[in-house]
UniProtKB/Swiss-Prot annotation:
CDD domains: OSBS. HAMAP family: MenC_1. Its EC number is 4.2.1.113. SMART domains: MR_MLE. One of its GO terms (molecular function) is O-succinylbenzoate synthase activity. This is o-succinylbenzoate synthase. Belongs to the mandelate racemase/muconate lactonizing enzyme family. MenC type 1 subfamily. It catalyses: (1R,6R)-6-hydroxy-2-succinyl-cyclohexa-2,4-diene-1-carboxylate = 2-succinylbenzoate + H2O. Pfam families: MenC_N, MR_MLE_C. Pathway: Quinol/quinone metabolism; 1,4-dihydroxy-2-naphthoate biosynthesis; 1,4-dihydroxy-2-naphthoate from chorismate: step 4/7; Quinol/quinone metabolism; menaquinone biosynthesis. Coiled coil: none annotated. Its cofactor is a divalent metal cation. Keywords: Lyase, Magnesium, Menaquinone biosynthesis, Metal-binding.
Amino acid sequence: MRSAQVYRWQIPMDAGMVLRDRRLKTRDGLYVCLREGEREGWGEISPLPGFSQETWEEAQIVLLAWVNNWLAGDGELPQMPSVAFGVSCALAELADTLPQAANYRAAPLCNGDPDDLILKLADMPGEKVAKVKVGLYEAVRDGMVVNLLLEAIPDLHLRLDANRAWTPLKGQQFAKYVNPDYRHRIAFLEEPCKTRDDSRAFARETGIAIAWDESLREPDFAFVAEEGVRAVVIKPTLTGSLEKVREQVQAAHALGLTAVISSSIESSLGLTQLARIAAWLTPDTIPGLDTLDLMQAQQVRRWPGSPLPLVDADVLEQLL
């Protein structure tokens, strides 16, 4: 006997949260809970404004239609990426095919005063890997901050993300302020320039390795080994089903590329599932999941060690 619930939710965000030049005041999304006999599985559907092609309102229509079909015995996955991902997670939990083991290690997202960051990062146990958003301020300032962090902490490796913010000139301005002796400790810089060709040129000219992120979701993208390209950053909410995520990880690994499972600012429920996916598909790589602190609450499932209050499913708005 099958049954299902769909919940709609909204979480207040930190006041300073800006995405693609827009302030994100709340994170909006949906949960689906599927039950069959004694088993149940949960999934999160939370399109990311400015990044997902679909809105959560559009996702809600597709999700409710899919759930009704599933209740009637038809389980074919929808095409819409956020719905395909959430539904496939719920089905995987239902079938017990999503391993429970999770990788809760985080590459902390660094912002704020560099002196405070140095103290925080110096105290990090184990492998020191952190993420810095660049491209939000002047490229010269970004270069100086990155150089300062690498100089102060000799065993630190940084993942940088420019979200295609730079022209070739700005990329050169950034690199000019990063000591060539430190550049090998930039694990990768995600999508430095507005075009892939400009990003490739940046890698060749600076010796700073790059990673593809947005490019993975473009129709002309192909997985190929390229000089200067070290990694791909996979955001499952923007990618689609678990199977598609696994195919992309396998394609990257076959080329010797690092594959990083990364957050699209999901709630704690979605983040704990991403931590399980990371442990399963990319066990040797620290995932990019340090986004929970951008929110003011957790929901349904806790992220280990988070002090944020937990909201239970029974107080969420139930649509089905």
